[in-house]
Amino acid sequence: MATERTFSIIKPDATRRNLTGAITAKLEEAGLRVVASKRIHMTKEQAEGFYGVHRERPFFGDLVSFMISGPVVVQVLEGENAVARNREVMGATNPANADEGTIRKTFAESIEANSVHGSDSAENAKIEIDFFFKPEEIVG
């Protein structure tokens, strides 16, 4: 098994409820190590750029508005099969379909306010990490 990196966002619904520590603890309990982390308030331009792949989707405007509605915590996570492990601990996008004990089942308010984002592939993880972090900000 290879050690890899993935990208995670703790979304505004979770930071608003002071869940950053609880969510990070679940990630660490799953064997992921936080190698970079910062709390930011995304600009509209950042959110539109980050979620640009969804630009033509009907939910794009609402997604951008939500992601700029409050602070987020962007993180680089490292571990064995980090992308798959992070997605497993996050749970299904819709918290109603998420397994018990997952972040979304435990903390999400709705399919839109689902507390976390995680990269869906190693390739996208690199793109997403590079969007928010300089190499010197990642300390393994």
From Swiss-Prot:
EC code(s) of this entry: 2.7.4.6
Amino acids binding ATP: 11, 59, 87, 93, 104, 114
Enzyme kind, highest EC tier: transferase
Main localization (coarse): cytoplasm
InterPro entries: NDK-like_dom, NDK-like_dom_sf, Nucleoside_diP_kinase
Role this protein plays: Major role in the synthesis of nucleoside triphosphates other than ATP. The ATP gamma phosphate is transferred to the NDP beta phosphate via a ping-pong mechanism, using a phosphorylated active-site intermediate.
NCBIfam families, alphabetized: PRK00668.1
Subunit structure: Homotetramer.
Name of the protein: Nucleoside diphosphate kinase
Provenance organism: Rhizorhabdus wittichii (strain DSM 6014 / CCUG 31198 / JCM 15750 / NBRC 105917 / EY 4224 / RW1) (Sphingomonas wittichii)
Gene: ndk
